[in-house]
């Protein structure tokens, strides 16, 4: 059944950089399948805006980390959410698509669904890892879930939630065999000698909590392995400014800070020390040995620990179903422990070969042409709605 051509409008919300990346991928697929006159609006980042998205609010207004840290931003977030819901109910777009940010989007999706506006959620929350009770909220709020990982649809099906496995766009974008030599040339790094990429996060709170520990670990590694070089991407000038005091405190480090280009920096590396998050999946798709770490405030950590189900937090370990790379979290993330684990990842050739096999299998499983599959799923929802109209 053909879709209407008269000013189709889709509302979308992405709440953080990883969501911006996913939403931009989806927008690219939708623009190929929907009328050229279709409009896309809501809350998004620069990648979405580059796809013709009209962002009515700044995405970083929604970007928070942890329970305690979010308290100060709750009034502003609630104000934005209220305005967005009123706008949706007044304008009645063809669908609302929430991209990740479940604590924000599920409330909006339920309001849309209750008003007869199809609600689609892109990125199934990790109900299989922690806070499994959220599946009840999903069942009330979401008409269709777009899943990044292959084991998620079976979980949702038990709760009566329609879903489509679409894979992960990073698996489509990253080549199966990374060009380490080319990445080193691009960054002006020596072709020979060990290189370790260090990624302490991109938020002020993350840098404050784990940045000093990562830099101390780098100093220890350089003492033990004098020929090692480090590369650290800074996504924005603001992040570089946050890192600068730590750089100044360790002038002896053979450290290259890049302007963005985190994927190039990781490609150039022999091993990676990385804060937990989506970037760990990127590192796995690049077939890199890594050490995963994080630090959050004590109370936030206690809440997360009590509500968790799995013994691991890093996506490579979750997808493998076992520990394939080490995780050093909270008080276990000492400079000495991080240095020991990272140098082991750097030097263990047998482990490197095993990880390459594991990560290649993971890569092939996730490589699904996500933009096309996600866009096709959205179009099917729109067609079904039109068929019922």
UniProtKB/Swiss-Prot annotation:
For biological process, the GO terms are:
lipid A biosynthetic process
Question: Which pathway does this polypeptide act in?
Answer: Bacterial outer membrane biogenesis; LPS lipid A biosynthesis
Q: Could you cite one Gene Ontology molecular function of this protein?
A: phospholipid binding
Q: Does the keyword Aminoacyl-tRNA synthetase apply?
A: no
- Please list the reactions this protein catalyses: a lipid X + a UDP-2-N,3-O-bis[(3R)-3-hydroxyacyl]-alpha-D-glucosamine = a lipid A disaccharide + UDP + H(+)
Key words of the record: Glycosyltransferase, Lipid A biosynthesis, Lipid biosynthesis, Lipid metabolism, Transferase
- The organism's superkingdom is given as Bacteria
EC class of the enzyme, as a word: transferase
Parts of the chain that traverse the membrane? none
What does the entry list under GO cellular component?
membrane
- Record-listed E.C. numbers: 2.4.1.182
Role according to the record:
Condensation of UDP-2,3-diacylglucosamine and 2,3-diacylglucosamine-1-phosphate to form lipid A disaccharide, a precursor of lipid A, a phosphorylated glycolipid that anchors the lipopolysaccharide to the outer membrane of the cell.
UniProt-listed NCBIfam families: lpxB
Task: Give the UniProt family note.
Answer: Belongs to the LpxB family.
The protein's name: Lipid-A-disaccharide synthase
């Amino acid at each position: 059944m053909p879709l209407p051509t008269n000013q189709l409008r889709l509302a979308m919300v992405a709440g953080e950089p990883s969501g911006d990346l996913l939403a931009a991928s989806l927008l690219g697929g939708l623009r190929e399948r929907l009328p050229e006159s279709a409009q896309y609006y809501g809350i998004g980042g620069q990648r979405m805006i580059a796809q013709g998205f009209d962002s009515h609010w700044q995405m970083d207004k929604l970007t928070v980390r942890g329970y305690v840290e979010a308290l100060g931003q709750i009034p502003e977030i609630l104000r934005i959410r209220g305005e967005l819901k009123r706008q949706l109910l007044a304008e009645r777009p063809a669908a609302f698509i929430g991209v990740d940010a479940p604590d924000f989007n599920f409330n909006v999706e339920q309001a849309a669904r209750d008003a007869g506006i199809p609600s689609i959620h892109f990125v199934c929350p990790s109900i299989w890892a922690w806070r499994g009770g959220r599946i009840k909220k999903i069942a009330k709020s979401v008409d269709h879930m777009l899943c990044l990982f292959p084991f998620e649809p079976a979980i949702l099906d038990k709760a009566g939630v329609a879903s489509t496995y679409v894979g992960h766009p990073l698996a489509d974008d990253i080549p199966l065999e990374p060009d380490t030599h080319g990445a080193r040339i691009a960054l002006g790094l020596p072709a020979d000698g060990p290189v370790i990429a260090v990624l302490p996060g991109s938020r002020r709170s993350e840098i404050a909590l784990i940045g000093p520990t990562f830099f101390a670990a780098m100093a220890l590694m350089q003492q033990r392995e004098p020929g090692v070089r480090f590369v650290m991407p800074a996504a924005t000038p603001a992040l570089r400014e946050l890192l600068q005091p730590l750089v100044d405190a360790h002038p002896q480090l053979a450290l290259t800070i890049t302007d963005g280009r985190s994927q190039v920096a990781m490609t150039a590396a022999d091993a990676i020390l990385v804060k937990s998050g989506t970037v760990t999946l990127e590192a796995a798709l690049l077939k890199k040995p890594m050490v995963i770490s994080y630090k959050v405030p004590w109370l936030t950590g206690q809440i997360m620990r009590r509500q968790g189900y799995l013994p691991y937090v890093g996506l490579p370990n979750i997808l493998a179903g076992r520990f394939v790379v080490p995780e050093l979290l909270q008080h276990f993330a000492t400079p000495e422990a991080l240095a020991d684990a990272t140098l082991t990842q750097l030097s263990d050739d047998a482990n490197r070969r095993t990880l390459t096999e594991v990560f290649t299998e993971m890569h092939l499983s996730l490589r699904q042409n996500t933009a096309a599959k996600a866009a096709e799923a959205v179009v099917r929802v729109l067609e079904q709605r039109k068929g019922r109209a």
